[in-house]
Protein backbone atom coordinates (compact mmCIF):
# COMPACT_ATOMS: atom_id res chain seq x y z
CA UNK A 1 0.00 0.00 0.00
CA UNK A 2 1.36 3.43 -0.96
CA UNK A 3 0.79 6.57 1.07
CA UNK A 4 0.82 10.24 0.04
CA UNK A 5 0.57 13.29 2.30
CA UNK A 6 0.00 16.88 1.21
CA UNK A 7 -0.75 20.10 3.04
CA UNK A 8 -3.26 22.50 1.48
CA UNK A 9 -4.22 26.00 2.59
CA UNK A 10 -7.93 26.58 2.06
CA UNK A 11 -9.18 30.15 1.59
CA UNK A 12 -12.57 31.04 3.05
CA UNK A 13 -15.19 33.21 1.34
CA UNK A 14 -15.53 35.32 4.50
CA UNK A 15 -13.63 35.75 7.75
CA UNK A 16 -14.98 33.08 10.11
CA UNK A 17 -15.19 33.92 13.81
CA UNK A 18 -16.29 31.99 16.87
CA UNK A 19 -16.11 32.96 20.55
CA UNK A 20 -12.37 32.16 20.83
CA UNK A 21 -10.80 32.76 17.39
CA UNK A 22 -11.10 34.12 13.83
CA UNK A 23 -9.55 32.99 10.55
CA UNK A 24 -9.54 33.62 6.79
CA UNK A 25 -7.50 30.55 5.84
CA UNK A 26 -7.52 26.95 7.01
CA UNK A 27 -4.60 24.54 6.69
CA UNK A 28 -5.54 20.93 6.06
CA UNK A 29 -3.80 17.61 5.49
CA UNK A 30 -4.94 15.31 2.70
CA UNK A 31 -3.77 11.71 3.02
CA UNK A 32 -3.95 9.24 0.15
CA UNK A 33 -3.75 5.44 0.38
CA UNK A 34 -3.29 3.52 -2.87
CA UNK A 35 -3.78 -0.22 -3.35
CA UNK A 36 -4.53 -2.27 -6.48
CA UNK A 37 -4.94 0.84 -8.61
CA UNK A 38 -7.46 2.54 -6.31
CA UNK A 39 -6.76 5.55 -4.11
CA UNK A 40 -8.70 6.53 -1.02
CA UNK A 41 -8.49 10.04 0.42
CA UNK A 42 -8.80 11.32 3.96
CA UNK A 43 -8.57 14.73 5.58
CA UNK A 44 -7.75 16.34 8.91
CA UNK A 45 -7.53 20.08 9.44
CA UNK A 46 -5.09 21.95 11.65
CA UNK A 47 -6.59 23.07 14.96
CA UNK A 48 -4.92 25.62 17.26
CA UNK A 49 -7.32 24.77 20.12
CA UNK A 50 -5.86 21.24 20.17
CA UNK A 51 -2.35 22.38 19.12
CA UNK A 52 -2.51 20.42 15.85
CA UNK A 53 -0.88 21.62 12.62
CA UNK A 54 -0.67 20.03 9.19
CA UNK A 55 3.10 19.87 9.66
CA UNK A 56 2.81 18.07 13.01
CA UNK A 57 0.47 15.48 11.49
CA UNK A 58 2.79 14.91 8.54
CA UNK A 59 5.71 14.45 10.92
CA UNK A 60 3.74 11.92 12.98
CA UNK A 61 2.69 9.88 9.97
CA UNK A 62 6.08 10.05 8.23
CA UNK A 63 7.51 8.42 11.35
CA UNK A 64 5.60 5.21 10.61
CA UNK A 65 5.40 5.50 6.81
CA UNK A 66 7.26 2.25 6.20
CA UNK A 67 5.01 0.37 8.61
CA UNK A 68 1.90 1.76 6.91
CA UNK A 69 3.14 0.84 3.44
CA UNK A 70 3.95 -2.71 4.52
CA UNK A 71 0.63 -3.15 6.36
CA UNK A 72 -1.53 -5.97 4.94
CA UNK A 73 -4.72 -3.99 4.32
CA UNK A 74 -7.98 -5.92 4.63
CA UNK A 75 -10.51 -3.67 6.38
CA UNK A 76 -10.54 -0.08 7.71
CA UNK A 77 -11.24 -1.43 11.19
CA UNK A 78 -8.09 -3.57 11.31
CA UNK A 79 -6.08 -0.66 9.92
CA UNK A 80 -7.49 1.65 12.61
CA UNK A 81 -6.52 -0.87 15.31
CA UNK A 82 -3.00 -0.89 13.89
CA UNK A 83 -2.87 2.94 13.97
CA UNK A 84 -4.10 3.09 17.57
CA UNK A 85 -1.02 1.16 18.65
CA UNK A 86 1.21 3.94 17.29
CA UNK A 87 2.00 7.31 18.84
CA UNK A 88 -0.35 9.31 16.64
CA UNK A 89 -2.78 12.11 17.43
CA UNK A 90 -6.45 11.46 16.73
CA UNK A 91 -6.26 14.09 13.98
CA UNK A 92 -3.53 12.16 12.15
CA UNK A 93 -5.40 8.89 12.69
CA UNK A 94 -8.53 10.52 11.26
CA UNK A 95 -6.84 11.48 7.98
CA UNK A 96 -5.60 7.91 7.54
CA UNK A 97 -8.83 6.28 8.71
CA UNK A 98 -10.95 8.31 6.27
CA UNK A 99 -8.55 7.39 3.47
CA UNK A 100 -8.80 3.71 4.45
CA UNK A 101 -12.60 3.75 4.38
CA UNK A 102 -12.65 5.54 1.03
CA UNK A 103 -10.12 3.03 -0.35
CA UNK A 104 -12.09 0.07 1.01
CA UNK A 105 -15.31 1.24 -0.61
CA UNK A 106 -13.58 1.94 -3.91
CA UNK A 107 -12.03 -1.54 -3.91
CA UNK A 108 -15.50 -3.04 -3.33
CA UNK A 109 -17.20 -0.60 -5.72
CA UNK A 110 -19.77 0.39 -3.08
CA UNK A 111 -20.47 3.61 -1.15
CA UNK A 112 -19.75 3.40 2.56
CA UNK A 113 -23.35 3.94 3.64
CA UNK A 114 -24.29 0.82 1.65
CA UNK A 115 -21.43 -1.20 3.14
CA UNK A 116 -22.74 -0.21 6.57
CA UNK A 117 -26.23 -1.49 5.75
CA UNK A 118 -27.98 1.88 5.41
CA UNK A 119 -29.55 3.69 2.47
CA UNK A 120 -29.47 7.35 1.52
CA UNK A 121 -33.12 8.05 0.75
CA UNK A 122 -33.70 9.86 4.06
CA UNK A 123 -31.24 12.08 5.87
CA UNK A 124 -31.12 15.28 7.95
CA UNK A 125 -30.43 18.63 6.27
CA UNK A 126 -27.15 20.29 7.10
CA UNK A 127 -27.19 23.66 8.78
CA UNK A 128 -25.28 26.62 7.32
CA UNK A 129 -23.01 28.39 9.80
CA UNK A 130 -23.00 32.12 10.46
CA UNK A 131 -19.91 33.15 12.42
CA UNK A 132 -19.66 35.98 14.93
CA UNK A 133 -19.50 39.34 13.15
CA UNK A 134 -21.08 42.78 13.10
CA UNK A 135 -24.85 42.38 12.95
CA UNK A 136 -25.22 43.80 9.44
CA UNK A 137 -22.54 41.36 8.24
CA UNK A 138 -24.39 38.41 9.78
CA UNK A 139 -27.62 39.52 8.11
CA UNK A 140 -25.81 39.95 4.78
CA UNK A 141 -24.40 36.42 5.03
CA UNK A 142 -27.89 35.01 5.56
CA UNK A 143 -29.24 36.94 2.58
CA UNK A 144 -26.30 35.77 0.47
CA UNK A 145 -27.05 32.15 1.37
CA UNK A 146 -30.78 31.49 1.97
CA UNK A 147 -30.93 28.21 3.90
CA UNK A 148 -33.51 26.18 5.87
CA UNK A 149 -31.33 25.86 9.02
CA UNK A 150 -28.69 28.25 10.32
CA UNK A 151 -26.14 27.54 13.03
CA UNK A 152 -25.41 30.88 14.69
CA UNK A 153 -22.10 31.25 16.51
CA UNK A 154 -22.47 33.29 19.69
CA UNK A 155 -20.41 34.29 22.73
CA UNK A 156 -20.84 38.07 22.87
CA UNK A 157 -22.33 40.47 25.41
CA UNK A 158 -25.61 40.75 23.48
CA UNK A 159 -26.34 37.26 22.18
CA UNK A 160 -30.13 37.26 22.61
CA UNK A 161 -30.40 40.65 20.91
CA UNK A 162 -28.44 39.28 17.95
CA UNK A 163 -30.87 36.39 17.51
CA UNK A 164 -33.84 38.73 17.90
CA UNK A 165 -32.51 40.89 15.07
CA UNK A 166 -31.59 37.94 12.82
CA UNK A 167 -35.07 36.51 13.27
CA UNK A 168 -36.50 39.59 11.49
CA UNK A 169 -34.77 38.51 8.29
CA UNK A 170 -35.58 34.78 7.99
CA UNK A 171 -38.06 32.10 9.00
CA UNK A 172 -35.31 29.45 9.02
CA UNK A 173 -34.64 27.25 12.04
CA UNK A 174 -31.81 28.49 14.26
CA UNK A 175 -29.26 26.43 16.17
CA UNK A 176 -26.98 28.20 18.64
CA UNK A 177 -23.32 27.35 19.25
CA UNK A 178 -21.70 29.41 22.01
CA UNK A 179 -18.44 27.42 21.93
CA UNK A 180 -18.13 27.24 25.73
CA UNK A 181 -18.67 31.01 26.22
CA UNK A 182 -21.71 30.97 28.56
CA UNK A 183 -22.20 30.16 32.22
CA UNK A 184 -24.92 27.82 33.46
CA UNK A 185 -26.90 30.82 34.69
CA UNK A 186 -26.67 32.60 31.31
CA UNK A 187 -27.73 29.44 29.49
CA UNK A 188 -30.77 28.88 31.69
CA UNK A 189 -31.75 32.58 31.47
CA UNK A 190 -31.25 32.88 27.70
CA UNK A 191 -33.03 29.67 26.73
CA UNK A 192 -36.72 30.74 27.08
CA UNK A 193 -36.18 33.83 24.91
CA UNK A 194 -34.20 31.85 22.35
CA UNK A 195 -36.87 29.16 22.22
CA UNK A 196 -39.49 31.82 21.43
CA UNK A 197 -37.22 33.05 18.64
CA UNK A 198 -37.20 29.66 16.90
CA UNK A 199 -34.00 28.15 18.26
CA UNK A 200 -33.99 24.34 18.00
CA UNK A 201 -31.14 23.54 20.40
CA UNK A 202 -28.01 24.88 22.08
CA UNK A 203 -24.59 23.43 21.33
CA UNK A 204 -21.91 23.36 24.04
CA UNK A 205 -22.82 26.55 25.91
CA UNK A 206 -20.55 25.79 28.91
CA UNK A 207 -16.86 25.05 29.32
CA UNK A 208 -16.05 21.45 28.39
CA UNK A 209 -15.27 20.39 31.95
CA UNK A 210 -18.10 22.28 33.71
CA UNK A 211 -20.05 19.13 34.58
CA UNK A 212 -21.67 20.67 37.67
CA UNK A 213 -22.92 23.55 35.54
CA UNK A 214 -24.24 21.17 32.91
CA UNK A 215 -26.13 19.24 35.56
CA UNK A 216 -27.97 22.46 36.46
CA UNK A 217 -28.63 23.18 32.79
CA UNK A 218 -29.97 19.68 32.18
CA UNK A 219 -32.59 20.14 34.91
CA UNK A 220 -33.54 23.76 34.21
CA UNK A 221 -32.94 24.60 30.53
CA UNK A 222 -36.03 24.66 28.29
CA UNK A 223 -33.98 23.87 25.17
CA UNK A 224 -32.09 20.64 24.36
CA UNK A 225 -28.33 20.90 24.78
CA UNK A 226 -25.84 19.09 22.54
CA UNK A 227 -22.28 18.27 23.66
CA UNK A 228 -19.38 19.23 21.41
CA UNK A 229 -16.16 20.13 23.24
CA UNK A 230 -17.27 17.83 26.09
CA UNK A 231 -17.55 14.84 23.73
CA UNK A 232 -14.23 14.13 22.04
CA UNK A 233 -13.68 10.35 22.11
CA UNK A 234 -15.68 7.17 22.68
CA UNK A 235 -15.13 7.18 26.42
CA UNK A 236 -16.84 10.59 26.70
CA UNK A 237 -20.22 9.39 25.42
CA UNK A 238 -21.39 7.78 28.64
CA UNK A 239 -20.70 10.81 30.83
CA UNK A 240 -22.24 13.15 28.24
CA UNK A 241 -25.37 11.02 28.33
CA UNK A 242 -25.92 12.11 31.93
CA UNK A 243 -25.38 15.82 31.23
CA UNK A 244 -26.59 16.48 27.67
CA UNK A 245 -29.51 15.63 25.39
CA UNK A 246 -27.24 14.68 22.52
CA UNK A 247 -23.68 14.64 21.21
CA UNK A 248 -21.88 16.25 18.28
CA UNK A 249 -19.15 13.94 16.95
CA UNK A 250 -16.17 15.44 15.12
CA UNK A 251 -14.25 12.90 13.05
CA UNK A 252 -10.91 14.66 13.52
CA UNK A 253 -11.27 14.72 17.30
CA UNK A 254 -12.37 11.11 17.79
CA UNK A 255 -10.01 9.61 15.22
CA UNK A 256 -12.13 9.00 12.13
CA UNK A 257 -15.13 7.05 10.90
CA UNK A 258 -14.22 3.83 12.71
CA UNK A 259 -14.67 5.22 16.26
CA UNK A 260 -17.48 7.53 15.11
CA UNK A 261 -19.57 4.52 14.09
CA UNK A 262 -19.13 3.04 17.56
CA UNK A 263 -19.97 6.37 19.21
CA UNK A 264 -23.18 6.66 17.18
CA UNK A 265 -24.26 3.18 18.22
CA UNK A 266 -23.49 3.82 21.89
CA UNK A 267 -25.27 7.18 21.93
CA UNK A 268 -28.40 5.76 20.33
CA UNK A 269 -28.50 2.97 22.91
CA UNK A 270 -28.47 5.69 25.57
CA UNK A 271 -31.34 7.56 23.92
CA UNK A 272 -29.20 10.52 22.88
CA UNK A 273 -29.65 12.60 19.75
CA UNK A 274 -26.68 12.22 17.42
CA UNK A 275 -25.07 14.92 15.32
CA UNK A 276 -21.87 14.88 13.32
CA UNK A 277 -20.11 18.17 12.77
CA UNK A 278 -17.38 19.37 10.45
CA UNK A 279 -14.44 21.69 10.45
CA UNK A 280 -13.82 24.29 7.75
CA UNK A 281 -12.63 21.58 5.39
CA UNK A 282 -12.75 20.36 1.80
CA UNK A 283 -15.10 17.88 0.19
CA UNK A 284 -12.71 15.10 1.22
CA UNK A 285 -13.80 15.37 4.84
CA UNK A 286 -17.37 16.42 4.06
CA UNK A 287 -17.93 13.41 1.78
CA UNK A 288 -16.84 11.10 4.60
CA UNK A 289 -19.32 12.74 6.99
CA UNK A 290 -22.08 12.38 4.39
CA UNK A 291 -21.75 8.60 4.45
CA UNK A 292 -23.05 8.70 8.04
CA UNK A 293 -26.15 10.76 7.18
CA UNK A 294 -28.72 7.92 7.36
CA UNK A 295 -27.67 7.27 10.97
CA UNK A 296 -27.90 10.89 12.20
CA UNK A 297 -30.51 13.14 13.76
CA UNK A 298 -28.63 16.35 12.90
CA UNK A 299 -25.63 17.22 10.76
CA UNK A 300 -23.29 20.15 10.30
CA UNK A 301 -21.42 19.55 7.04
CA UNK A 302 -21.21 22.98 5.45
CA UNK A 303 -17.41 23.25 5.69
CA UNK A 304 -16.70 23.08 1.95
CA UNK A 305 -19.50 25.56 1.17
CA UNK A 306 -17.59 28.17 3.18
CA UNK A 307 -14.53 27.89 0.91
CA UNK A 308 -13.63 30.14 -2.01
CA UNK A 309 -12.37 27.08 -3.89
CA UNK A 310 -12.71 23.42 -3.06
CA UNK A 311 -9.75 21.11 -3.71
CA UNK A 312 -11.86 17.98 -4.24
CA UNK A 313 -15.01 16.54 -5.74
CA UNK A 314 -17.35 14.24 -3.89
CA UNK A 315 -20.69 14.76 -2.22
CA UNK A 316 -22.41 17.93 -3.47
CA UNK A 317 -24.83 19.99 -1.40
CA UNK A 318 -27.62 21.76 -3.29
CA UNK A 319 -28.91 25.27 -2.62
CA UNK A 320 -31.82 23.77 -0.67
CA UNK A 321 -29.56 21.60 1.46
CA UNK A 322 -30.20 18.43 -0.56
CA UNK A 323 -27.28 16.04 -0.99
CA UNK A 324 -26.10 14.53 -4.27
CA UNK A 325 -24.00 11.44 -3.62
CA UNK A 326 -21.19 10.54 -6.06
CA UNK A 327 -21.30 7.36 -8.12
CA UNK A 328 -17.82 6.25 -7.01
CA UNK A 329 -17.43 3.78 -4.17
CA UNK A 330 -16.21 4.67 -0.70
CA UNK A 331 -16.68 8.34 0.12
CA UNK A 332 -16.60 8.99 -3.62
CA UNK A 333 -13.75 11.49 -3.46
CA UNK A 334 -11.44 12.68 -6.24
CA UNK A 335 -8.91 15.52 -5.96
CA UNK A 336 -9.00 18.55 -8.27
CA UNK A 337 -5.22 18.88 -8.24
UniProtKB/Swiss-Prot annotation:
Residues annotated as binding substrate: 129, 151-153, 250, 300-302
EC number: 5.1.1.-
Keywords: Isomerase, Magnesium, Metal-binding
A Pfam entry, by short name: MR_MLE_C
CDD domains, A to Z: L-Ala-DL-Glu_epimerase
Cofactor(s) the record lists: Mg(2+)
Keyword Signal: no
Additional observations: Part of a large, functionally divergent protein family. Protein modeling and substrate docking were used to predict the substrate specificity, prior to biochemical analysis.
Protein role: Broad specificity dipeptide epimerase. Catalyzes the epimerization of L-Ala-L-Ala, L-Ala-L-Glu, L-Ala-L-Ser, L-Ala-L-Thr and L-Ala-L-Met (in vitro).
Family of this protein: Belongs to the mandelate racemase/muconate lactonizing enzyme family.
Name of the protein this chain belongs to: L-Ala-D/L-amino acid epimerase
Organism: Maribacter sp. (strain HTCC2170 / KCCM 42371)
UniProt lineage: Bacteria, Pseudomonadati, Bacteroidota, Flavobacteriia, Flavobacteriales
